[in-house]
């Protein structure tokens, strides 16, 4: 279990038939030798229709830690954030001590009526705290357009003979 170093302090007191010297305390540090867990996405891509209201992306640890694990994330892609296509800003995910996963949620996916290409939301992990970054550090979520293409109407001009 990855954990912080631990200390044991031994203090001598109340000697019998002796006198304590100035060195009556000893501190021993137990150095943690376990590797920090690896943090990354459990899958690197997924998709859903515009009618999906939100999508939770799972971030996993390779092992539980006795310390909180943090990881920053940045949001890019072809979809527009700030409520236009979805809501999710750059941020930091905290996975509490003892847990092995956390979620980053793409919220308020907008079911618009525009016929458009599929759009992507790319979430990239960086700067882990109390963990090391794994190779699956980016997740691409594709918002699949569910709108029909507009109907094409064409007109033909007819000239009729007069009688």
Q: What spans do the regions from the language model cover?
A:
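Short, solvent-exposed loop/linker segments at the N-terminal edge
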Residues: 46-53, 158
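Proline-enriched interdomain boundary motifs that mark the N-terminal boundary
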Residues: 37-43, 150-154
């Amino acid at each position: 279990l990855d954990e912080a170093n631990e200390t044991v302090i031994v203090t001598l007191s109340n000697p019998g038939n002796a006198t304590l010297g100035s060195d009556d305390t000893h501190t021993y540090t137990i150095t943690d030798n376990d590797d920090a867990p690896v943090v990354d996405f459990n899958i690197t891509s997924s998709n859903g229709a515009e009618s999906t209201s939100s999508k939770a992306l799972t971030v996993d640890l390779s092992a539980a830690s006795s310390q909180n694990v943090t990881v920053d994330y940045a949001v890019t892609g072809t979809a527009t954030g700030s409520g236009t296509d979805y809501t999710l800003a750059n941020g930091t995910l905290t996975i509490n001590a003892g847990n092995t996963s956390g979620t980053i949620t793409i919220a308020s996916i907008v079911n618009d009526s525009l016929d458009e290409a599929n759009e992507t939301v790319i979430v990239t992990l960086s700067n882990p705290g109390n963990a090391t970054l794994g190779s699956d550090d980016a997740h691409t979520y594709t918002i699949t357009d569910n709108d029909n293409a507009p109907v094409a109407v064409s007109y033909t001009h007819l000239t009729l003979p007069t009688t």
